[in-house]
Amino acid sequence: MTQEKRSLHKTPPDGGWGWMIVIGCFFVTVCTRAVTRCISIFFVEFQSYFAQDYARTAWIHSIVDCSTMLCAPIGSYVSNHFSCQVGIILGGVLASTGLVLSSFATSLEYLYLTLGVLTGLGFALCYSPAIAMVGKYFEKRKALAYGIAMSGSGIGTFILAPVVQLLIEQFSWRGALLILGGFVSNLCVCGALMRPISLKEDSLHYPLKREPQLDSSCSPLCQDCSHKKLCYCTTKEYHFLLKPKFIILAVSFLFLAYGCSPPFVYLVPYSLSVGVSHQEAAFLMSILGIVDIVGNITFGWVTDRRFLKKHRYCCYLIAVGLDGLCCLFLPILTCFQLLVPFSVMFGYFDGAYVALIPVITGDVVGTSNLSSALGVVFFLHAVPYLLSPPIAGWLVDTTGDYTAAFLLSGFSMIFCSILLGLAKIINRIKKNPQATVVRSSDIKQEVWTNGDVSCLNAIS
């Protein structure tokens, strides 16, 4: 009964409780994405304690990212069929439990299961539903709202990176993981903020969502009709998968996800390998995080301006391409003074395109499909996130340096940008001939009928 009395908004309110949703999503990104990034600070500790090579140790970070993205559709399902609050609170419990259990690890395989799978599953239940909720509350200021919400990743990295390093020094890596587990339990509080909202667009797309369930005593014919309606609703929920624009976007995410992960995993180990101290290496992650915030908010604000709103797609692909270009230069930066500009540039463009991912996705599929679409988008990140750090680690073990690993990441992101650019150009070329036909059809044509001349104007 409570759900039936929920107020129906014609359009997103663009404010009000929406700002509390932004704050909640902000802290969700702190507890999920920032904590995931800071796992790379444990890399050297795990490698030293368990006496393993780069590739095997890198699987920990890969499994966390992969589980988060692979299970994203589960988060979308729970959000769509129960509520966003239920999904985030449940995810907070699982993620916190995974980190606490990881503090008792006796092998890398144990960490694969607890820190990788269990924590990653918890993050998945929180991440995509929280991001989708922001899109339901904002339309005119959507990019700015997402910029603020997604900046939690950068702010969290800036604060947590040195704190985690300090916790490791004071309490060992076991104590640091235990404290992180308590910190991540705050996701349950974030979930309580996610007040549901019903939009007119939702009721138009999914009118059958709240139909009462048929009793088992109903006739087989009625049950068959109900089953067909349920299948129809499910099909409508994912009809965007057949859109050519979404297919191109989905393919580009595969290359983007492969390229963006290794720099975060190997920035600290690479810095240590060229003589940078542990504190300075952690500070590089902090710089990257704080500039990431600037990229989130400024790019979100700028692309909300009227003159750039229609060009968000181009802004997104430019940011991705420049981020890849930064990776190509990383192998020649061999001191702290040169690595600082890298952290600034890479962090800014990373924040820029990350803030636009849900915006671009929403522009393609619509607000009513955003939660399901984000589940698919993050699902596509799973395999690249799983494979890219171990592949990069294998390249480091094989070649003896980080050059090949960073070059592969850079070229992958640049290819993603080129793919999106080519799709944009092809789409524009396809539209031009149609425009030419319409213009030529406006010319008056003479038609001879019984000796009279009639002038027919083509109706466009």
Curated annotation (Swiss-Prot):
Compartments reported by the entry: Cell membrane; Basolateral cell membrane
CDD domains attached to this UniProt entry: MFS_MCT12
GO MF annotation list: creatine transmembrane transporter activity; transmembrane transporter activity; uniporter activity
Catalytic activity from the UniProt record: creatine(in) = creatine(out); guanidinoacetate(in) = guanidinoacetate(out)
Pfam entry (one): MFS_1
Entry keywords, A to Z: Cell membrane, Membrane, Transmembrane, Transmembrane helix
UniProt xrefs under SUPFAM superfamilies: MFS general substrate transporter (SSF103473)
Stretches that traverse the bilayer: 11-31, 58-78, 86-106, 115-135, 148-168, 177-197, 246-266, 282-302, 329-349, 354-374, 376-396, 406-426
Highest taxon of source: Eukaryota
GO biological process: creatine transmembrane transport; creatinine metabolic process
Membrane topology per record: Multi-pass membrane protein
UniProt keyword Transmembrane helix, yes or no: yes
Ranges of the Cytoplasmic topological domain: 1-10, 427-460
Record bears the keyword Cell membrane: yes
Assigned GO CC terms: basolateral plasma membrane; plasma membrane
UniProt family annotation: Belongs to the major facilitator superfamily. Monocarboxylate porter (TC 2.A.1.13) family.
Function: Functions as a transporter for creatine and as well for its precursor guanidinoacetate. Transport of creatine and GAA is independent of resting membrane potential and extracellular Na(+), Cl(-), or pH. Contributes to the process of creatine biosynthesis and distribution.
Name this protein carries in UniProt: Monocarboxylate transporter 12
Gene: slc16a12
